């Protein structure tokens, strides 16, 4: 599937010392979304004590979640390929299956002490190298940017995960030069990142924030159906691209659901 995701506006820098900062990704008219993500100084504890002990994600849990992703992508590969046959090359499901099988092989090669950020960056590079079309660089960039945002920590709490989702969405938008409303992967990922970050900033637990994010991702995916494609091979179809789900938006939902803990 060759899909490019339009340029994005430069995001304003966070105010030093602020608890929450807001960034915006440029969107098509009617698709305004702000990204709210907790910002903490190094060593600062979360404001809500419950977040310190609930829903901590370490490298082992990330590894397990990627095995779930591989299984989920394999189960949905034929459907993703059928969707892509309408708007793209008809290979999206097969390409993603190849990529996440390669990721599972990578997990067996990496040392057990690999940090979460290092693990995510390695996964991103493997996806770039193994997934055909544009979806490899797009998904790969999302994982790489999330890994950079994770830093050198051994455990990720909900505020950190919110920041990582925001970084993933921003990185994918930059790499694909896409905006919300272009009928791309971003239509699913950006609402998920926004909703998770807002929920955590409002004091939700990680599990509750994940449920909110998945609901927003599902709505975002469905919202790609009436859109006219502005990027990728579907662009050539013009108005005829409307009425079909974007295959990248669908695969993103599959991946997010698996990452959230549903096999």
Where are these regions (language model features)?
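N-terminal loops that bind phosphate or other acidic moieties
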Residues: 1-263
């Amino acid at each position: 599937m060759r899909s490019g995701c339009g340029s994005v506006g430069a995001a304003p820098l966070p105010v030093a010392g602020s608890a929450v900062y807001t960034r915006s990704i440029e969107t098509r008219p009617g698709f305004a979304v702000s990204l709210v993500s907790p910002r903490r100084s190094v060593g600062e504890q979360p404001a809500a004590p419950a977040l310190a002990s609930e829903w901590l994600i370490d490298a082992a849990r990330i590894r397990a979640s990627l095995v779930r992703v591989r299984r989920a992508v394999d189960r949905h590969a034929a459907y993703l390929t059928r969707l892509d046959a309408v708007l793209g090359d008809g290979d999206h499901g097969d390409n993603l299956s190849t990529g996440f099988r390669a990721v599972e092989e990578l997990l067996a090669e990496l040392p057990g002490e690999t940090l979460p950020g290092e693990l995510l960056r390695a996964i991103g590079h493997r996806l770039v190298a193994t997934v055909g079309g544009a979806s490899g660089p797009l998904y790969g960039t999302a994982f790489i940017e999330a890994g950079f945002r994770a830093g050198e920590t051994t455990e990720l709490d909900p505020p950190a995960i919110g920041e990582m989702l925001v970084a993933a969405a921003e990185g994918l938008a930059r790499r694909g030069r896409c905006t919300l409303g272009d009928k791309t992967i971003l239509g699913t990922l950006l609402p998920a990142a926004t909703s998770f970050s807002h929920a955590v900033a409002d004091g939700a637990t990680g599990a509750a924030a994940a449920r909110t994010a998945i609901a927003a991702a599902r709505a975002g995916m469905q919202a790609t159906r009436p859109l006219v494609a502005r990027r990728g091979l579907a662009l050539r179809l013009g108005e005829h691209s409307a009425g079909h789900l974007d295959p990248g938006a669908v695969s993103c939902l599959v991946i997010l659901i698996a990452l959230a803990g549903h096999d």
